[in-house]
Amino acid sequence: LGAAYEKAHPGTKVDFNFAASGVLLQQISRGAPVDVFASADETTMDQAQQQDLLAAGTREVFAVNALWVVVPPQAKASPRTLKDLAGAGVQRIALGNPDSVPVGRYAKGALEAAGLWPSVQGKTITTQNVRQSLDYVARGEVDAGFVYAT
């Protein structure tokens, strides 16, 4: 995407800053230079808009994602449904911090909607971002983790 933009606009250099949406919002609110802010959730975009950090009329939904539960390749228990996460075979679940990480808010919301949050809340290991959840899963430090399909 950056290379295509640079090609279409000679002399322009695109720099990316990838981080959790809340972290990026804090950087922007403290004056970090930015031309495009792509948040992983509507809540963070709402906060940016409430803080007048978005140019009027520029907010657009340009992509969507799906929430996935992933398990380590060597997992003994392989949950197939959200309900399986409440079972005895799943002891630790990586979940982005619902207070600050969009994937965590979405995961908690899905578990609440399924009536499972009380059963799994004590099993959750909160992470700072999706990448950390995925790393915990890849290393087999948790039995499952919530990530985005992408």
Regions found by a protein language model. Give the residues of each.
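Exported/periplasmic ABC-transporter solute-binding proteins
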Residues: 1-18, 22, 26-30, 39-42, ...
